[in-house]
UniProtKB/Swiss-Prot annotation:
This is Ribose-phosphate pyrophosphokinase. SMART domains: Pribosyltran_N. It comes from Caulobacter vibrioides (strain NA1000 / CB15N) (Caulobacter crescentus). One of its GO terms (molecular function) is kinase activity. Keywords: ATP-binding, Cytoplasm, Kinase, Magnesium, Metal-binding, Nucleotide biosynthesis, Nucleotide-binding, Transferase.
């Protein structure tokens, strides 16, 4: 087995390698003067089971091209089986047509990864689970609910006043999965209506949050506007405190400042996307590593063991 890392999140790749007690494969992923991507694999991978670790986060197009070219290089070097390990799958929010003459970019990206030579995809908490069906190759979508539940138990006392909250109707299934792992905690839903692109307006809270310690749970925090508005609404409805757990911390623009100035007690995100300097500097943002989860999935795939047992 070989592990290869792109440039999008080398600290996570190194952490996964440490979990598996093996080194990263020597490779050079660099750019020419015109920013074309060039990849050289510096070790023999003929007949090997190779895992390429690369989130397609910002800059999404550059990191996607790196991934595709790495896969192509490995295929031409006679790698036996190539698994694209994509902790954060960019373009996942473009999973359907939202109007006339608009693309389904998530499907296009799935086609590109497949045609580049990948034999399998391993990802985590897709924005929409049905994106798995966009791939014509085996695709495993890891769920972070166990990882998050373990962290919550370490940092928050369990009790009847603990409540899991979905920041929108679309995330109810995700939030319910976390609630079940927290002694079947109560569930609430924030009904929000977007007032424009990149903006959100909280309208209503479904569930009684008065005097409850609320845990918001979602897959992506981009501008963090949804989270901060939801937290404000929960506090206005009598919540005792509000924390947030997010799988993918995109945290673009002024997101870190927005979190710092919000009523959130803290925002906990995985390291599926490498932390930006503003995120590292924000006292309310804390990272929990997904390396053990991804590393264990890689080990199971390489040994032909069940990956679904990780969801039990």
């Amino acid at each position: 087995m070989k592990l290869l890392s792109g440039n999008s999140n080398r600290p996570l790749s190194q952490a996964i390698a440490e979990y598996l007690d093996m080194p990263l494969t020597r490779a050079q992923v660099r750019r020419f003067a015109d920013l074309e991507v060039f990849v050289t694999i510096d070790e023999n991978v003929r007949g090997e089971d190779v895992f390429v670790i690369q989130s397609t986060s910002y800059p999404a197009n550059d990191n996607l091209m790196e991934l595709l070219i790495c896969i192509d290089a490995l295929k031409r070097a006679s790698g036996k089986r190539i698994t694209a390990v994509i902790p954060y799958f960019g373009y996942a929010r473009q999973d359907r047509k939202t109007g006339g003459r608009t693309p389904i970019s998530a499907k296009l990206v799935a086609n590109l990864i497949t045609r580049s030579g990948a034999d399998r995809v391993l990802t985590m908490d897709l924005h929409a689970g049905q994106i798995q069906g966009f791939f014509d190759i085996p695709t495993d979508n890891l769920l972070p609910s166990r990882l998050m539940a373990e962290d919550i138990r370490r940092h928050y006392p369990m009790g009847d006043d603990l409540m899991v909250v979905s920041p929108d109707v679309g995330g109810v299934v995700r939030a319910r999965a976390l609630a079940k792992r927290l002694d079947d905690a109560d569930l609430a839903i924030v009904d929000k209506r977007r007032s424009g692109p990149g903006q959100s307006e909280v309208m209503n809270i479904i569930g009684d949050v008065k005097d409850r310690r609320c845990i918001l749970f979602d897959d992506i925090a981009d501008s963090a506007g949804t989270l901060c508005n939801a937290a404000q609404a929960l506090m206005a409805h009598g919540a005792k405190s509000v924390s947030a757990y997010i799988t993918h911390g995109v945290l673009s623009g002024a997101a870190a400042d927005r979190v710092a100035n919000s009523v959130l007690t803290e925002l906990v995100v995985t390291d599926s996307i490498e932390a930006s300097d503003p995120a590292k500097a924000c006292p309310k943002i804390r990272y929990v590593s997904c390396a053990p989860l991804i590393g264990e999935a890689i080990r199971r795939i390489a040994n032909e063991e069940s990956v679904s047992k990780l969801f039990d």
